[in-house]
UniProtKB/Swiss-Prot annotation:
Belongs to the bacterial ribosomal protein bL20 family. It holds the Pfam family Ribosomal_L20. This is Large ribosomal subunit protein bL20m. It comes from Xenopus laevis. Keywords: Mitochondrion, Ribonucleoprotein, Ribosomal protein, Transit peptide. It is found in: Mitochondrion. The lineage of its organism: Eukaryota, Metazoa, Chordata, Craniata, Vertebrata. GO terms for biological process: translation. Residues 1-9 form a transit peptide. It comes from the Eukaryota.
């Protein structure tokens, strides 16, 4: 390839600069004030917006989980239980529903959620009765309290 003149060999920066500016302004169109028209202001605003959007992806997960937990806790209180008790007893019953599904059930399927709460409450009562026992010592176990006579 032969370059006949220096002006042909040097790359023209004009078109590239135009499209780079348009790309930044495209991302800044919804901003208020001069930030959506003035390139130097738009560059800073777009860069800051991208930083916020990166951080917001992680924050959104935490916020949504907190929302689901608060919804479940509110619905659980209506049935006379607390959130940790409901979740731990559902796990013991091998109910494989995540917080999002349980939260949606509490809003859109209240009867189904009521049956889940009843299941967890029944599991809790079984655990309490098993822990209390019938008051007798299990076979093969001597007294837990040693009496010296």
């Amino acid at each position: 390839m032969v370059f006949l003149s220096l002006s042909r060999w040097v790359r023209s920066r004009g078109p590239d600069r135009y499209w780079r500016v348009q790309e930044v302004l495209k991302h800044a169109r919804h901003f208020r004030g001069r930030k959506n028209r003035c390139f130097s202001l738009a560059v800073r605003a777009v860069r800051r917006a991208f930083v916020y959007s990166t951080k917001a992806r992680k924050a959104k997960k935490r916020i949504m989980r907190a929302l689901w937990v608060s919804r479940i806790a509110g619905a659980t209180r209506e049935h006379g239980m607390k959130y940790p008790m409901l979740m731990s007893n559902l796990v013991k019953c091998q109910v494989a529903l995540n917080r999002k599904v349980i939260s949606d059930m509490s809003i859109y399927e209240p009867k189904t959620f009521k049956s889940l709460a009843a299941l967890a409450k029944r599991r809790r009562d079984e655990g309490i009765l098993a822990a209390l026992g019938d008051g007798k010592e299990p076979e093969g176990i001597f007294s837990r309290v040693v009496n010296y006579h």
